[in-house]
């Protein structure tokens, strides 16, 4: 006889769930899309680069089902277009993973054009995506923000990136309280240093691989496992914030 005290008796299955992932073609977003698809979720992704989109859809198609469009979420109008396309393709959604982001440096070293673009992708698109997700979910489901430990580890060249991630952190906490009465869960996942397709400044792919081997850096798949954990909690439980750090991440 099943023991109802066992939390796993209420663990929801991902099979058949409809999930949007902003980004979803490289790095953390791609790892999330592949893992969730392997558990039976149907995925909708986007990319600025049609080549990345085609490659990601091929990979996800090896383990599950996915759709996507080539679109740049830096354009505010494109966020709604992406969500409308996803809802149409999937027939509704059960979760939105707001993940698409680009690197940014210190404000004194960035051009105004690059600064505006970073804000559009890393902050404005996050809020607009949450707005679209809340409307699409209506009265159930999950919104997961992929933030960064950069919100807490403030370096000399991180003013823009850390500032935006700090903003996402505060927004996520307030939104969680706002949407709770509507049966929509909101979680913020904050990864530490994670191997990325966009290169860290002065940190080559070979150096990233060595850092991962030394457990000083995470793999994108580690964050995907965290997303899976959040999405498979019983309805009575919510993971409000999840920090995932390398065991040996050096202090900044």
Name these PLM-found stretches.
Residues 106-119:
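Substrate-binding pocket helix/loop in short-chain dehydrogenase/reductase
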Residues 39-55:
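Conserved glycine-rich Rossmann-like NAD(P)H-binding loop of the short-chain dehydrogenase/reductase
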Residues 188-189, 208-252:
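C-terminal helical subdomain
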Residues 25-26:
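Conserved glycine-rich cofactor-binding loop
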Residues 148:
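Residue(s) in the substrate-gating loop at a strand-loop-helix junction
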Residues 130, 164-165:
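Active-site helix of classical SDR
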Residues 50, 70-82, 112:
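The beta1-alpha1 cofactor-binding region of Rossmann-like NAD(H)/NADP(H)-dependent oxidoreductases
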